[in-house]
């Protein structure tokens, strides 16, 4: 943002609000939740003006953002997983949001089934009130990946140009893959069959073939390999386990099936 504002002040045509963190108390204490309450703020929207401090804060945030041309809710992943840059969309709002998301310079647009979407999130609350909101996930929790930051910045300026907010030069954006997961057609999951230490063999964004080795689970006491983790389908490994300790059922990765990679159209 500093680069663009220093060089192109005459390119701005409207107001852009930037919120570095919606949970500054959590940033200060290096936690996702609200300190003392251990409460995930992104599970209490739209909030309540007559509720406790946390619900009141959530309600004020929704009121502040409601009515914007577009809201972009930017997240890193959690500390357990690393993700390629992607936008996640509830299928209930796909018709409005997918065409917008395709201008955002992300690698993947992932449309979820309605049954898997949490209704208490900021994005769901704003979209339900008619304010278009995109959820961006990229990288790994508690870290900043400069490469992804630059990619997201180009995407933001592309979107602002689309909405007439930015009138200066606009970078070209990549063509996003659009995956529909309402019925599990495009995405498959890798879950740990046992507990142990997970050692990945593939980075996120890697192309894999069916039954190709993507990681191993090792017994931490003996060093013995107790499970080989193989790709269930050919495609792209767009989520990879970053945190090594796993339990039975832990998510270790997600594969975007090959057919979704070749379609690339809505």
Question: Residue ranges of each PLM-predicted region?
Answer:
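Structured catalytic-domain cores with a bias toward divalent-metal coordination
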Residues: 1-266
